[in-house]
Amino acid sequence: MLAALVKVLNADTVVEIGTHTGAGCLALKAGQNPSGKIFTYDVISWDQLGVPSLLTTEHFDGGGIVQLIGDLSKDAFFEENLEKLNSADLIFMDAPKDGIFEYKMLDQLAKLENKKGRLLVIDDIRFVNMIDFWRQISSPKLDATGFGHWSGTGLVDLSDGLSFARP
């Protein structure tokens, strides 16, 4: 589903929040034009995780993937990366699912400039601690779980910004 979304949107710039083993990143890249860029963010480098990664150095050396290490929920790091984030056609959020980080990220993503056709894809919206989070988003959205990940896939239209309520 991720590759298809990137392809249909013709997403030249993709932001992934939460690299982990790279499965999502590689799925996103599979649907992208060869000239496209993926900026993938995590607090730990892909090669320092301590678990096997699907990523290799070739993905980063001219492969169109750039990993940035830091916490996007923190104001300073978010501001440092604002230009990359504002250029994104698609943002894939596949991060901790602790019920705290996600709300911090919504606060941050609400600061982005409006961009017609920009889509936010949120993974695991059916996890018990993500259900209320998903319900708080009032921007146009679609629960695409039937087409996406078994644990839930949410699509949010960010064309006119992001609206949500805090619990």
Residue ranges and their predicted role:
Residues 3-167:
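S-adenosylmethionine/decaboxylated-SAM
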